[in-house]
């Protein structure tokens, strides 16, 4: 981002894992803040299930795993995508003064209120966003692109920002529910 003209840059990633946090402190010489999104784990896993079921190129389909239980276990193992995010959330509590926590359900049910809190946290005046039909984000000629992990991982639904029921929540294997169902935010 060194060549970007913006004074404030919001990057998506698990910055508060211990390793990432040390790298930020070492190489990013200015104070920084973290916006931590909290979403119930079963909702996250249901989204993963829907994504890898509907998109054959999704990364959980690249390892010869056959069942939902195998795919979700891979995502949740200590080096898995979701496990890294959970580690980042857990470690963020060591730095509460520099973190702002946003519950996913609050964000999708009242986005303007949550964005106002974020702007207050970063010390910036509020900017009116379009929550009725937001469209894709594009900054400095770059669009959000996560195709490396598979198509459509973070696609936006058309229309107003809202919570959308995901029927895959009911298809999460029982052993996965038993092992991880207690993780809620």
Where are these regions (language model features)?
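Short acidic alpha-helix initiation/capping motifs at coil-to-helix transition points
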Residues: 23, 109-113, 153
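Conserved beta-strand scaffold positions in the cores of enzyme catalytic domains, especially
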Residues: 34, 99-101, 184
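PAPS-dependent sulfotransferases, especially Golgi type II membrane carbohydrate sulfotransferases
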Residues: 49-52, 90-93, 120-185
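Alpha-helical packing segments of well-folded alpha/beta enzyme cores
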Residues: 20, 78-89, 114, 168-180
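PAPS-dependent sulfation machinery
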Residues: 1-31, 54-66, 157-158, 166-171, ...
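Short beta-strand segments
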Residues: 9-13, 36-38, 101-103
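PAPS-dependent sulfotransferase catalytic domain
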Residues: 1-2, 42-122
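Conserved phosphate-donor/acceptor-positioning beta-strand/loop module used by diverse small-molecule
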Residues: 27-51
């Amino acid at each position: 981002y060194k060549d970007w003209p913006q004074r404030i840059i919001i990057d998506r990633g698990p910055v508060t894992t211990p390793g990432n946090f040390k790298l930020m402190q070492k190489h990013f010489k200015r104070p920084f803040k973290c916006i931590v999104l909290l979403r119930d784990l079963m909702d996250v896993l249901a989204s993963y299930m829907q994504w890898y079921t509907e998109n054959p190129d999704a990364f959980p389909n690249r390892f010869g795993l056959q069942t939902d239980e195998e795919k979700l276990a891979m995502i949740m193992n200590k080096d898995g995508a979701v496990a890294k995010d959970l580690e980042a959330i857990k470690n963020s509590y060591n730095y509460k003064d520099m973190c702002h926590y946003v519950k996913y359900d609050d964000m999708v049910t009242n986005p303007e209120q949550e964005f106002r809190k974020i702007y207050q946290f970063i010390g910036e005046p509020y900017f009116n966003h379009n929550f009725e039909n937001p469209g894709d984000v594009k900054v400095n000629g770059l669009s959000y692109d996560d195709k490396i992990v598979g198509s459509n991982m973070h696609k936006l639904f058309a229309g107003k920002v809202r919570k959308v029921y995901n029927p895959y929540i009911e298809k999460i294997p029982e052993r996965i529910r038993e092992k991880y169902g207690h993780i809620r935010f």
